[in-house]
Structures are given as structure tokens and as C-alpha cells.
Amino acid sequence: MLIQKLASLAVLVPVALATDPIKPNRTILFHSHNDYQQPRPVYDAFDAGFRSFESDLWWDKDADKFYVSHTILTIDHSKTFQTQTLDRIMKIMEGNYSPHYTKDMPHKFLTASDNKPTSQPDWYKYYAEGFGGVRPIQLLLEIKSNDGAVSWPHLMKALDPLRERGWLTKWENGKIHYGPVIAVGTGGTPADEMAPKTSRDYFFDCPAGSLNGTVKTSSGASYPFNSTLCPMSSKSYIDVPDSNLGLLPPPPKAPTQFHREIVETHKHNSTTRFYGVLPGSLARIDDFNMLIQQGSDWISTDVMSDQCAYNRS
């Protein structure tokens, strides 16, 4: 399939590359993909205006630690989930990192008059505006060690400092209770720990464009995707037909394909993210422009300057 896609690129009519990002009419949400690979994980993206950070996690039961790395071969034992992500998030939220996030901000978020439990969450508004003038921080957590059932409890324990302060967004008594931090599991996150739960303070990165279906647990039980489970829904950019693998500007058929995926996801009140646009691709901005024009919510990128380019005042 990859070879067929690559071969098809050779017959495409060339399209001029965009010179500038478009000016969107709404706040575009930015997600720091492979954030742990930045020179200063979390901090670089936060300073650039990102409020969502991704961690690829490898559980080591002997060390009792999660390491952050894209592959098992590139694990650096000095880089753990604690040191590269959690400690930095805590420093920001406790007001010890940036003048743009003071220690009273979590309290402002939680006590804002319009921050009320709801059974019909507006996730885009939550991410784009937050409450009390404070936007939330998202942790996108991908278990890559292929042991989700074993490692998931340890990951939940690692979030205890956020949980103990009452900062985590949670699903409880049939309603979403918004917090200044939201933890979203992706990749090897076990469905058993998500869909059947009647109370939880973590969420699921659902499959964009496929929310009319169901999620299945290890027992074979099926649960419908819904907005109380899926604040974000993602899909690989190159898995959408006519994507050009993100190597060339989108051809005329691409907008229709992406629009279909986005509309279907929005019907379930989830937000959309397409990942995998190569940071070094000359067509990157064309891809992002097209996604924004079709109504996608998130831009997933490793390039810190992208956020300022689109959300400039």
C-alpha cells in the first residue's frame, strides 16, 4: 500500500506551495507531538503557546519507571516520564516557571462561575478558552511498551500529584467535571480501563472519522464512542485517502476526504487531530492550511514556531 501511494505521487499535477499560513477565524489548538524530543520538553512548547504535550511511554518494572522515547532502541535512562514531563507540568502549574501561569490560575479555573459539571461537554471551548481566563493543559499519554494492562495502574499512580490537588478533569456521576489538566490515553491504552468505567479522571484518544462505531474491551463487550469518553479523536494524516503522505500539497480530492472525517467526529462533540505531517516537509503549511479550512481543531506538530504563525494576533 505504501508503494502504491508513493507511485501515485509521480502522476500528480504539481501544486504551488503556500508561502504563508492562512489567518484562521478561530483559535487553532496546537499539540506538541513527540514533545520529549524538544531541547527542553514541555517548556519549549509551553513558551511557544502549546497547551498539549505528548509522551511515548515505556514501562520498566525493574526500575519502576516509565521512560520516554519514540522507540525501545532510543531509550535514554536519564529521561523518564517524571523528569521530562510530570515535574515540568507541576512546576508550571504551581507558578514556579512562567509569569504567564501564576500559582492562582488552577484555582481560578476551578472556581469560575461558568465551570459547571455537564453531561454534554463542549471540548473545543474547553481547550480553546478554558475557564476563568485559564486554558487547560493536556497530557497525551501513549503506552508503547505493549503492556497496557500491566503498566496502566502505574501510570495512574504517577498522576497522583495532579489528582490530589483536584486538577484532573474527571467523569463522575454521569457528568464531566472540568479541571485545569486533562489526561488522555492513546496508543496502547487499555479500553478496559476506559469505556466501562463509571468514574475516572482520564480519557480516550478515539479514532477520528470512526466514532459511529464502538470500542471493544478484552471481554468482547462493546461500548459506543461518545463525548464523555472522547475529548480528542485522532488519525494518521497519511491514512486518509489522497493525503499525498504529507509530502506534497493536498490534491483537489483531499479536502473532501478530510472534511468527511472531521464532520463525523464533530457530530460526537469530539475534537479532531491528524498526526504524521513530516516536520521537514515543504508542503507542511499547505497540509495545515487545508486541515484548518476543513474545520479540524488541532495541529499536531514538532515545529514550535507553527503555533505563533497561525495564532498570531
Feature map (PLM): residue ranges:
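Catalytic cores of phosphodiester-bond hydrolases, prominently lipid phosphodiesterases
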Residues: 19-36, 41-54, 58-313
